[in-house]
């Protein structure tokens, strides 16, 4: 009898960024090597009425029942944010009791599964309640901000996260660095490391393909330096104009600078690019399906983020043959090497631009770590599940 796994995560179907893509990669890779029936559910929180007015949020233009991404059907679970929760949390630091009730009610939909795999905090609440009600093993995957940002900035979230870390059959973390951050919250939890990996579509094209692609995009006779990600403060994107300008000064050759992504700070960054006089192109929000071809044109990826868990974007860039430099945050060195990450101090912009210019000037080997493989991660995930499934009766 085929075992059934439910994968639950929180996301936004209109914004497919790192965590969203990491979940899909895990599902696709596990399906490829193991005979599981895997169903995927996404929690999308929405505002309406008083909550939308207070948060100045924009309502979703539509609320689909399901979407499909990379051949994976995702059933949508739409959960309304409560204005009582928002007020109680804002004024008194209270737990969101209405939201928690709505999440726990969703657990009834998971009663027939053998395993529930949840990604980050909201999904973990659903999975934990399902495990308590129906007795199946539950696994929580942690990707970044839900460990190193939210619990640090909010006492209520810290208490909640500590409870969740202690509760599942096992926690999965995307890096050793993220485990160290979690241990700052509590030393007591079970865990395994499941590194992010680049899916097969992210690979280095042939020399002929790359030449045709670069010619079509107008960068056949120059180097390309890029940033890929959201345009918001935690990403330090306002530093990009200065970083790119210094790279242009330090490299003796033509350089074009690209950005891929969107966010409320993009206009500020564009003005900085205009003032610096660099040659640039801002692609805006790029469909994930197109990222492999753009990365195959990139020579160096720059990631100055203030905080990152284990940035999937750097792994995808390396898989396509680009070099990568980044700020020395939670786990960036695990993916791109200690020599290519730099402390966020007064010398950061000078240091990261110098390393990027060096990479443009001469070949620097920067191999993708063997462990950063979707296949390797799927193999390990399957082995962990099998240890627990062998203890369960069929059709429990």
Regions of interest found by a model, annotated:
Residues 118-123:
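Short His-centered aromatic/hydrophobic patch
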Residues 177, 197:
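Carbohydrate-associated surface elements
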Residues 306:
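Aromatic "clamp/platform" in nucleotide-sugar-dependent glycosyltransferases that forms part
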């Amino acid at each position: 009898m085929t075992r059934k796994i439910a994968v639950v995560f929180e996301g936004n179907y209109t914004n497919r960024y790192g965590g969203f893509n990491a979940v899909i990669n895990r599902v696709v890779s596990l399906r490829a090597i193991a005979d599981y029936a895997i169903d995927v559910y996404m929690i999308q929180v929405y505002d309406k009425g008083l909550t939308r007015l207070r948060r100045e949020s924009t309502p979703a233009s539509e609320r689909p029942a399901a979407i499909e991404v990379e051949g994976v059907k995702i059933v949508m679970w739409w959960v309304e944010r409560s204005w009582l929760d928002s007020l109680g949390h804002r004024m008194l630091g209270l737990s969101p009791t209405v939201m928690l009730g709505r999440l726990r009610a969703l657990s009834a939909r998971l009663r027939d599964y053998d395993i529930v795999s949840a990604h980050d905090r909201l999904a973990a609440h659903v999975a934990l309640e399902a495990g308590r009600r129906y007795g199946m093993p539950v696994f929580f995957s942690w990707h970044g901000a839900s460990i190193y940002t939210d619990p640090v900035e909010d006492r209520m979230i810290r208490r909640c996260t500590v409870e969740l870390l202690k509760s599942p059959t096992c926690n999965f973390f995307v890096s050793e660095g993220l485990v160290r951050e979690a241990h700052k919250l509590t030393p007591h939890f079970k865990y395994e490391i499941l590194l992010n990996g680049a899916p097969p579509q992210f690979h280095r094209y042939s020399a002929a393909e790359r030449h045709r692609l670069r010619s079509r995009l107008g960068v056949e006779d120059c180097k390309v330096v890029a940033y890929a990600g959201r345009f918001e403060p935690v990403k330090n994107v306002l530093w990009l104009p200065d970083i790119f300008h210094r790279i242009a000064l330090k490299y003796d050759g033509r350089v074009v600078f690209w950005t891929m992504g969107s966010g409320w700070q993009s206009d500020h960054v564009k003005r900085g690019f205009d003032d610096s006089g660099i040659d640039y192109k801002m692609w805006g929000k790029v469909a994930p399906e197109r990222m492999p071809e753009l990365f195959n044109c990139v020579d160096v990826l720059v990631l100055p983020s203030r905080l990152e868990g284990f940035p999937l974007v750097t792994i995808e860039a390396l898989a396509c043959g680009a070099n990568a430099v980044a700020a020395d945050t939670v786990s960036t060195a695990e993916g791109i090497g200690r020599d290519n990450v730099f402390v966020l101090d007064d010398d950061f912009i000078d240091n990261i631009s110098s390393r990027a210019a060096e990479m443009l000037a001469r070949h620097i080997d920067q191999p993708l770590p063997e462990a950063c493989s979707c296949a390797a991660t799927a193999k390990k995930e399957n082995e962990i599940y099998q240890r627990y499934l062998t203890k369960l009766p069929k059709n429990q």
